[in-house]
């Protein structure tokens, strides 16, 4: 038996793992306008198009400033990447329309950002603190869960 077939071998119990069946649905490609928050704009797209959940397929653009949270030995910290013109290198994660009204369904988007000095930073995008600089183009794909 390997670690994949024996969930307890890596210290995770079944209460920490959730498996679900589903399929991909519609694709939305959108332009996020200057000074719109990236996380909030993606959640609003889900709401506008009636998508409960979506995965990020691609994000291209830059931010006024970047703010990422990350876990450290002494808890969660935040890092501010000074702009303007912080480049988005990669964004991945799941967007949840319910996150706009329900904190129990948080959107979790991780990103790699490049500062104006070329340094690269990674972490979770902080809601309300990552504003589009000029524009951001984003592609989301709906995830539809299947009933058990």
Label every PLM stretch briefly.
Residues 2-57, 64-148:
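N-terminal intrinsically disordered, cationic/polar leader segments
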